[in-house]
Amino acid sequence: MNKKIKLALIGTGGISGAHADGILKHQDKIECVALCDVSEQNLEARAKQLGGSPARFLDWKKMLAEMGNGIDAVDICLPHHLHAPAIFDAAAAGKHILCEKPMCINLDEADKIVKAVKKAGIIYMSAHNQLFTPAVQEIKRMIDGGAVGKVRWIRSQDSFILPNTALKGQWRANMKFQGGGELIDTGYHPTYRLLYLAGAEVAAVRGTMGRFLHPMDGEDTASVQVRFTNGVIGEILTSWVFNRPYGTHDLHVIGELGEIFGTGNMLYHLPVGFKTPSEKILKEANTFHDQINCFADCILKGLPPPHGPEEGRAVLQIILKAAESAEGWQKNTGKK
């Protein structure tokens, strides 16, 4: 493809604002020609942010039918339970897809999505934006370069305090729409970071969950242990009820030759035998800008996406297995 990509944004609330910023940053490659949402207020806000005169729709099926070849790709930023239906319709219409996390809310949907994408011959990219953070990319480079030798243990964390009124009356508090609790939401980020750095398939998963603060069906805090087929032990800690001293998310890798700790654009490397780690300040990055740029390049240059539907399924499988192993956590913590 040698032209500018014509994109439709399906879902114009919340996180779509960050996606829109990425579109504006890379207007030389991609432009938003249509918006779809059931909320007129959301449509108005996003149209104002993007500028121009994108077509507005209340129904994505109608949008896909009426716009036809006027759309090359879609960016899906809907509530979780609507991801799969929108993906199926966009794939059937032959549109390339960027979809927010999670890809869907169960493995049956995930398997059907993998098949639908292959059948349509389109590019599907999972919106794993935190893989574009400087610390994640540098840690991956160091692991692959042997800086810590054989990796033994990886911890991936994403935690912050969400006000206890934030979920009141929201779809995220409802298991039917959310597909789970915090782990399938914010916790999705540290899960895909762990999978990316471990570089192997999952052998076993065990989860522990709790709900300490928020009025919701699912958990607001989760701890997950993962064993990989290459022997790496992984840990995920994610929560909406406590802060971290190093920012909202961080990574810690221990190998036979040393350790790496990273958060945001800061990196610390402690080889075996040293008492003081070396410190490296990495270049700042906007992961949503980089994500949109990557998606556009995949379409324009015919490149495979760095994280497609298979990766989306693998992340979801860890989350669902953790939830299954933690079944009964509400009763165990006295929460009903």
Kindly label every feature range from the protein language model:
Residues 38, 281-293:
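Active-site loop of classical SDR/Rossmann-like NAD(P)-dependent oxidoreductases
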Residues 1, 73-75, 229, 297-336:
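C-terminal helix-rich "cap/oligomerization" subdomain common to oxidoreductases
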Residues 112-129, 149-154:
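Rossmann-fold dehydrogenase core element
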Residues 130-215, 329:
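Predominantly a Rossmann-like dinucleotide-binding segment in NAD(P)-dependent oxidoreductases
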Residues 1-51:
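N-terminal Rossmann-like dinucleotide-binding module
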Residues 19, 54-116:
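Beta-loop-alpha module in the N-terminal Rossmann-like domain of NAD(P)-dependent dehydrogenases
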Residues 99, 105, 124-126, 236, ...:
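Hydrophobic residues in well-ordered beta-strands that form the structural core
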Residues 1, 191-266, 289-303, 322:
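Contiguous beta-strand/loop segments that form the cofactor/metal-binding neighborhood of enzyme cores
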